[in-house]
Amino acid sequence: MKHRGIFITLEGIDGTGKSTQFRLLVEALRRRKLPVRATREPGGTQTGEQVREILLASKTGKLAPLAELALIYAARAQHLGEVVRPALEHGEIVVSDRYNDSSYAYQGYGRKLGVEVVRAFDRIVCGATQPDLTLVLDLSPRVALGRAQGRETRRRSRHGRFEAQGLAFHQRVRRGYLEIARRQPRRVKVVRADRPIAVIQAEIRNLVDKFLTEHESQGGNRNLGLGGRNKST
């Protein structure tokens, strides 16, 4: 069943500045008085945040790839039932920092589980609840990894597990994202992340504006259209 709201996801390898762009986009949409539900994966619910701790903790570095994937989809099932689907059914714009494309890129490509294994989980858990628009922030893995490692050092965080995987892992993840974009160009838009934050955000807002305008022109929920709202804010 097609939902009434709009589902937008932001994706990318670690170190692309994705979470910053996510925050700026959510703030911009809220300034327009649009009904926005901001969330993230892994996380978004109490159960999801607990799973996030398990996944990101350095001490779980030997977690088997299939176990990792199963944990992620367990958290995703809870997230969908508790947050995403109810918000979409109420006509909200759900903006998520990561969703199922992360599983295809990180576990399917990065962990070498393969796309079909991820798809099997996705059919059961996500079903028809797929993103309407996905923005992939793209950056050289070498540059992104340097950023991510610097960030973790500054924060003295124990959540460095994915950054610790090395360059080859992140190169595979990037290839996964670009392959998804190649196969689904209408839904997935690649945004260069090697530019200033403001420039990246301007492109993201333009892509979202275009999508929302097209959505309304095609008979979508008019409460989500830009209408007379100020696009420049």
Where are these regions (language model features)?
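Hydrophobic positions on the alpha1 helix immediately C-terminal to the Walker A/P-loop
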Residues: 21
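A glycine- and Lys/Arg-enriched "phosphate-lid" helix/loop adjacent to the NTP-binding pocket
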Residues: 103-175
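Conserved lysine of the Walker
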Residues: 18
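ATP-dependent small-molecule kinase phosphotransfer cores
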Residues: 28-126, 203
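P-loop (Walker A) phosphate-binding loop of NTP-binding proteins
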Residues: 13
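Hydrophobic anchor at the beta1->P-loop junction of P-loop NTPases
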Residues: 10
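NTP-dependent small-molecule kinase module
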Residues: 26, 142-233
